[in-house]
Every structure is written in structure tokens, then in C-alpha cells.
């Protein structure tokens, strides 16, 4: 009941805030959700004690084809979201998250897919004295991603509409600090949407999408950050990655990549030493090299000045065994002009995250 009361108060405030004359081409939506924590790792079984619930409050800006990319992606929305989640376990605590998101439309704009990325705050992370059972979250600040698939109807009652659907919310600190088994919530959501304007603007349908390609371009990127092995208390260490790759633009929205990564992962120095003295049966001498080299192929999906980058790699130089020879990378890239870019990416081995990477680069 308290979630519905909170939701009503928030929505009432938004209605009062939205009483303006000029067109804003935006709307608010408010969803209540309830679901289950997915058992992706048996180690978190003791943390699953109830059905998590919470609210998702969002502001959304509509697009009407004023720019070519808006028409190519069927007039998506973009906006910001706030998520409050009660994980129904005192050990886990509660999460508060702030996200940027896109909404993509299908089936005559009745079906929406939202993808959001942001930062969440956990109220009760791991502490070796006060909260040693919380092996899901090793830090207050978490990386969080959520996806929402809704059947939505707008303007059913004046400016009010309804939506119902499914949500997936992921929380992890990406091995910035151990422990980090993470939490995934699968939930059913339902809620209201409210359009600020009395009526929508007209859609532009003047796209002349001629074939577009570019010659092969060459990229150099530098990525860095901090991470830790799975050994609690082993310490956080900086890492550095140099990447060189070629890309071929296939269309306005798509490009393919082929390149090489060189990894300088300082946390492996500590892990190599730890295994050499603690687990002699694993035949680790302590002199193994902490560096790795990988070859990768990738794809880039362009959305305005942003892009979604996905890569699959294989270590060709792999002197110390850590999580297997294949790796993946997914993240967001932002272009500044035609040559320079910044990126935030997640590197993982299957479902096991290794690091959040912050990168800069040049394309020539």
C-alpha cells in the first residue's frame, strides 16, 4: 500500500509541475513492480527470502523525425529514470538508481522496449564485521542496467494512459571491489503514463536514406579503471588497456570491427602471488606474466552521436589462467566530432564481470 501512496503523491506533483502552455513533447510514466531474484549463482541462495518490489519513475522526451536518426529508429523516446527497489532481505538492503534510457517502439507503437543504464546506491553492502553475509554487493555504488518490455496505451483517459509488462534489473559493481556476485531481478510491472501536451506533434516522414558506407578507418583507444580479484581483501589495483582496431562502416547505423587488445591487469600480480603461496597444488610458480593480449571482432550500432559497442575476443597471449581464454565487451561510446570518442564499457568472461572500463580514443 505504501508504494501506491508514494506513487500517487509523486504523480500528483508531476501533474502540477506539467501545467505549462508551450509544447514539451514529453511525458511521465510511473510503474510499480514486483518479482523474484534470479538464482544465477547458488552462493546467493541465502539472500533470496522474498519478492522484491519497488517503483520506476521516468521522464521521457518524444522524437518526431526532426533528425534522420529518429526516423531510422521509428521515432524513439529518450529520458531519465529513477528506480527504488526493496530487495526484501535485510542483508541486501535497498537500492536507489538513476538511469539514462531509450524507448524503442514496435507493433504500431503499442509495444515498447526500454533499455536503461545508470548508477545505483545500495544501503547495506558487504562489511566483514557488520554484514559479512552480503556477498552480492561489495560497495555502496553499483553499475546498473535495466530493460523493460511494455504493452502501452496512451491517452485512454484524457492525457492518462496505462502500461503493463516485464522488467529485468541488474546490479553489479563489476569487480571494482570484492565480493561481487550481483543481483538480477525479474519482475512484472504495471503503471500509468501522462502526456504533458494536449496533443502530439506531427511525425516527419521525409527520410531519404541513400546507401551509406565509409572506407576502412583505424582506431586507437586507451582504457583504464580499478578492479579486484574475487579474493576478499586482496586490494584494488589500476588496470590499463591499449587497443588498436580497424572498422568498416556498412550503413548509417552499423559498422564492424577487427582489432587487438593489450591488457596490463595489476590485480593479477596479487592473484598470481596469492595462488603460488596458498595453493601449491595448482602449480603456479609466482613468476607468471600478468599481461595478456587478445584479438577481437566487434559490431557498433549508431544512435545519433552515441553508439552501442559489442566485442568478442580471444586471448592469444595467456600466461596465467583466469576465467578462460574468451572475453566479451559491451558498452556505450560517445563521439565528439568525426575523430574523437569517449567510452564506458563492461568487460566480462561469460556472465562473470572483470571490470568497468573508462576509455578515450581517436578514429583516423
Predicted regions: what they are:
Residues 19-67, 202-247, 363:
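Short glycine/proline- and aromatic-enriched beta-strand/turn motifs that initiate or cap beta-hairpins
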Residues 26-45, 66-72, 92, 107-160, ...:
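Outer-membrane beta-barrel translocator/channel fold
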Residues 28-32, 78-80, 113-117, 147-149, ...:
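Membrane-embedded beta-strand positions of outer-membrane beta-barrel proteins
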Residues 32-38, 61-63, 82-88, 117-123, ...:
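Transmembrane beta-strands of outer-membrane beta-barrel pores
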Residues 48-51, 86-95, 230-237, 250-252, ...:
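Solvent-exposed loop/turn segments connecting transmembrane beta-strands
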Residues 57, 184-203, 353-364:
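Outer-membrane beta-barrel "beta-signal"
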Residues 61-63, 104-106, 151-155, 194-196, ...:
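Residue-level signature of outer-membrane beta-barrel architecture
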Residues 66-68, 109-111, 155-162, 198-201, ...:
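Repeated loop/turn-to-beta-strand initiation elements of outer-membrane beta-barrel proteins
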Amino acid at each position: 500500500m505504501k508504494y501506491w501512496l508514494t506513487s500517487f503523491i509523486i504523480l500528483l506533483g508531476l501533474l502540477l509541475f506539467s501545467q505549462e502552455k508551450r509544447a514539451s513533447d514529453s511525458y511521465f510514466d510511473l510503474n510499480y513492480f514486483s518479482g523474484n531474484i534470479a538464482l544465477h549463482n547458488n552462493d546467493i541462495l541465502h539472500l533470496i527470502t522474498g519478492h522484491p518490489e519497488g517503483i520506476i519513475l521516468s521522464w521521457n522526451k518524444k522524437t518526431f523525425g526532426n533528425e534522420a536518426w529518429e526516423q531510422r529508429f521509428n521515432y524513439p523516446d529518450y529520458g531519465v529514470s529513477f528506480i527504488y527497489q526493496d530487495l526484501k532481505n535485510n542483508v541486501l538492503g535497498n537500492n536507489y538508481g538513476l538511469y539514462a534510457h531509450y524507448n524503442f517502439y514496435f507493433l504500431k507503437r503499442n509495444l515498447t522496449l526500454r533499455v536503461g543504464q545508470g548508477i545505483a546506491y545500495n544501503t547495506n553492502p558487504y562489511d566483514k564485521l557488520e554484514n559479512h553475509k552480503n556477498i552480492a554487493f561489495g560497495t555502496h555504488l553499483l553499475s546498473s542496467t535495466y530493460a523493460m518490455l511494455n504493452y502501452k496505451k496512451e491517452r485512454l483517459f484524457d492525457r492518462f494512459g496505462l502500461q503493463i509488462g516485464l522488467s529485468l534489473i541488474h546490479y553489479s559493481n563489476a569487480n571494482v571491489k570484492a565480493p561481487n556476485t550481483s543481483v538480477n531481478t525479474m519482475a512484472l510491472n504495471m503503471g500509468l503514463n501522462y502526456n504533458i501536451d494536449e496533443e502530439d506533434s506531427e511525425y516527419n516522414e521525409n527520410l531519404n536514406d541513400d546507401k551509406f558506407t565509409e572506407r576502412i578507418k583505424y582506431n586507437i583507444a586507451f582504457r583504464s579503471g580499478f578492479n579486484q580479484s574475487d579474493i576478499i581483501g586482496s586490494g584494488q589495483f589500476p588496470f590499463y588497456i591499449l587497443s588498436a582496431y580497424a572498422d568498416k562502416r556498412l550503413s548509417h547505423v552499423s559498422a564492424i570491427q577487427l582489432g587487438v587488445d593489450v591488457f596490463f591487469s595489476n590485480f593479477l600480480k596479487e592473484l598470481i602471488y596469492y595462488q603460488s603461496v596458498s595453493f601449491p597444488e595448482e602449480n603456479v610458480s609466482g613468476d607468471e606474466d600478468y599481461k595478456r593480449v587478445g584479438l577481437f571482432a566487434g559490431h557498433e550500432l549508431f544512435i545519433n552521436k552515441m553508439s552501442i559497442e559489442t566485442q568478442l575476443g580471444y586471448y592469444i597471449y595467456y600466461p596465467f589462467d583466469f576465467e578462460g581464454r574468451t572475453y566479451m565487451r559491451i558498452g556505450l561510446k560517445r563521439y565528439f566530432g568525426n575523430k574523437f570518442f569517449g567510452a564506458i564499457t563492461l568487460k566480462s568472461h561469460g556472465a562473470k564481470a572483470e571490470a568497468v572500463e573508462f576509455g578515450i580514443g581517436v578514429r583516423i
